[in-house]
Swiss-Prot record:
Bilayer disposition of the protein: Peripheral membrane protein
UniProt keyword annotations, A-Z: Cell inner membrane, Cell membrane, Membrane
Pfam family membership, one: YidD
Protein's name according to its UniProt entry: Putative membrane protein insertion efficiency factor
Provenance organism: Neisseria meningitidis serogroup C / serotype 2a (strain ATCC 700532 / DSM 15464 / FAM18)
Superkingdom of origin organism: Bacteria
Family note: Belongs to the UPF0161 family.
Subcellular location: Cell inner membrane
GO CC annotation, single: plasma membrane
Signal peptide start and end residues: none
PANTHER family, per the entry: MEMBRANE PROTEIN INSERTION EFFICIENCY FACTOR-RELATED (PTHR33383:SF1)
């Protein structure tokens, strides 16, 4: 089940990266970008923990939040 959810999440993230992201200006304050971080987190930890890490990272990515290099733990 986790495998299928991981594949679904990765597909949605890749769709965003290739179809939506090129249409909007870059604004991620971190490296790797939030979408790449999400891919790495889901691949490393699976859909549930990786998805939770990705959501927490996206929530931190705003002008008053942090910035810089923030790899997947």
């Amino acid at each position: 089940m986790n495998f299928l959810l991981s594949k679904l999440l990765l597909g949605l993230i890749r769709f965003y990266q290739y179809c939506i992201s090129p249409l909007i200006p870059p604004r991620c304050r971190y490296t790797p970008t939030c979408s790449q971080y999400a891919v790495e987190a889901v691949k490393k930890y699976g859909a549930f923990k990786g998805g939770r890490l990705a959501i927490k990272r996206i929530a931190r990515c705003h002008p008053l939040g942090g910035h810089g290099h923030d790899p997947v733990p």
